[in-house]
Amino acid sequence: MSPLDCAFTPSLPKTALVTGGAQRIGRVLCVALARAGFDVAVHFRHSQIEADQLVQELQQLGVRACAVQADLDDATSAEALLAQARAQLGVIGVLVNNASMFEYDALTQQAPLSVELFEQHWRANTFAPMLLTQQLAQQLPLEHTGVVVNLLDQKLCNPNPDFLSYTLSKAALAQGTVLAAQALAPRIRVMGIAPGLSLRSGEQSDADFAQKHNQTILQRGSTPEDLAHALLYILSAPSMTGTTLMVDGGQHLTASARDVMFLP
C-alpha cells in the first residue's frame, strides 16, 4: 500500500503545522502531507522566499497552505506561532516539530561550551516543541484527536561527544515525547522519528556524504522521503504513542566515537 493511501482517523483534523517547513527535510514533509490531503502551515524563521514558493506549490496540489514566521529561539515569538497557523487554517490537528538548531560545541578547548549556545539549543530544540505541543492540546476541541511528531536523532541511541548542546537538547525532547504522550492521552498521540544520515552534516562534502550514507548495516542511510513515509504511517496508526521510529538504515546499531562528519 502506498503511504498516500493510508487511512486517517476521522476525528483527526487534516490540518498540520510543520516547523522548519520551508527547506530541506521540512519541505519534503510538507509536500507529503499536502499530497495526503492535509492543509499545511509552513513555518519559517528567515526563509520567507522559500516558504512562499512552497505554499504556492502546496496550493497547486489542491489544499490550503500558508507561511507562518517565528523565531523558535525566542519564547514570545514561539508562543504566537500556533495561533498564527490556526487563524489561517482553523483547528490544527497535526504538529510536526522538525525545526532544529544544530551548532557545534563539545567539552574541548577548540569548541568549548557557552551558556548562550547551550540555552539557544534548549529553547529551540526542547522548549519550543513542548510549548507548541501544549498549545496544540489547548486549542483542540474535545471531539477531535491530534498527533504530535518530534524529529529526534539516531545518535541518542548511539551517542558521541560531538554537538554536545544539540545532543542534550534532543535527548530532553525524546524524554518529553514520552511524558507528553502520557499527559495528553487518549486524545493526543505523541511520537518521535529518529533519522540517520539524511542530509549533509555541517561542512561535509557531497562525496563524503555519499560514502557515509552507504556505511550503515543496510548500506543506505535515510532519505527525507523515508522520513515522510514514516510520518504518514504514524498519522495512520492510532495505536502508537510515546515511542520513536528509528529511520536510519540501522545506523544506531553501529557504534561511532565521533559524529559522521569527522569519520574517515
Predicted features along the sequence, with ranges:
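Active-site loop of short-chain dehydrogenase/reductase
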Residues: 12-14, 63-64, 91-92, 139-153, ...
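Conserved glycine-rich cofactor-binding loop
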Residues: 22-24
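Conserved Rossmann-fold SDR core element
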Residues: 33, 174, 184-198, 240-247
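Conserved glycine-rich Rossmann-like NAD(P)H-binding loop of the short-chain dehydrogenase/reductase
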Residues: 38-53
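Catalytic loop of short-chain dehydrogenase/reductase
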Residues: 101-102, 109, 113-117, 146-185, ...
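A conserved structural motif in NAD(P)-dependent oxidoreductases
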Residues: 216-227
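C-terminal substrate-recognition "lid" of short-chain dehydrogenase/reductases
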Residues: 225-247, 252-253
